[in-house]
Every structure is written in structure tokens, then in C-alpha cells.
Amino acid sequence: MSKALLRYIRLSPTKARLVAREVQGMNAELAIASLEFMPNKAAKVISKVIASAVANGGMGAENAVVKSCRVDAGPVLRRFTPRARGRATPIRKPTSHVFVEVVEQSKDK
């Protein structure tokens, strides 16, 4: 089992979790290929983390299975934008931590 972790990525955890759920339990090679055609920013990020986890384990992508793909919330950058009558409203810029675990596929399948 090998792991990869990407922290403080400027990405909404809610949107990233939608992509992370799609690849859980998939073959790593198939997961990377399917993420390549998704239009989300999260797809590109998660694809790189899966590739990193496979490389960390020293195995080929065709022999690896995504055991878990988890997206946790990181700190939120708070900015303010000016509004009418001298007021200011907050802008939330969320960050995420992406965690991927990859295991080697069993030979009997």
C-alpha cells in the first residue's frame, strides 16, 4: 500500500469530493484516464495525486487499485470586497487536502 498527500490546494472540498468518489475502487490506470476527460479543476489535481501514489509504491498504474481517495477541508482564506454604502462582504476562498491510498491488485482476478 502506498499513499500520496497534497495539502493546501486552492480548491473547494465539496467540489473535489464529487470527483474523488468517482475514482474510489477503480484501477489506477483507468482512473487517471477517466479523470483526463473530466472538465473539473479537481479532476486534474486528483489525477496527479493518484499518479504520485502509484510512483511512491514503485508499482505500475496497471497493477494498482485506488483503495481510498479522501478530500478534507483545509483552512479558508478570507477576503473582503467593497459593497454599497461603505460596507464590505466576505469572500471565502476554501482550500483542500487530497489524500490517496493505492494498493497492488491481487493476481487471482
Swiss-Prot record:
Q: Which GO terms describe its biological process?
A: translation
GO cellular component terms? cytosolic large ribosomal subunit
Q: Which residues form a coiled coil?
A: none
In terms of InterPro entries, this protein maps to: Ribosomal_uL22, Ribosomal_uL22_bac/chlpt-type, Ribosomal_uL22_bac/org-type, Ribosomal_uL22_CS, Ribosomal_uL22_sf
Which Pfam family is an annotated match for this chain, by its short name?
A: Ribosomal_L22
Signal peptide span per the entry?
A: none
Query: In Gene Ontology terms, what is one molecular function of this protein?
Result: structural constituent of ribosome
What CDD domains does the entry give?
Ribosomal_L22
Per UniProt, the keywords (alphabetical) are: Ribonucleoprotein, Ribosomal protein, RNA-binding, rRNA-binding
UniProt family annotation: Belongs to the universal ribosomal protein uL22 family.
- Job of this protein: This protein binds specifically to 23S rRNA; its binding is stimulated by other ribosomal proteins, e.g. L4, L17, and L20. It is important during the early stages of 50S assembly. It makes multiple contacts with different domains of the 23S rRNA in the assembled 50S subunit and ribosome. The globular domain of the protein is located near the polypeptide exit tunnel on the outside of the subunit, while an extended beta-hairpin is found that lines the wall of the exit tunnel in the center of the 70S ribosome.
Return the PANTHER family for the record.
CHLOROPLAST 50S RIBOSOMAL PROTEIN L22-RELATED (PTHR13501), LARGE RIBOSOMAL SUBUNIT PROTEIN UL22M (PTHR13501:SF8)
Protein name from the UniProt record: Large ribosomal subunit protein uL22
Look up and give the organism this protein is from.
Wolinella succinogenes (strain ATCC 29543 / DSM 1740 / CCUG 13145 / JCM 31913 / LMG 7466 / NCTC 11488 / FDC 602W)
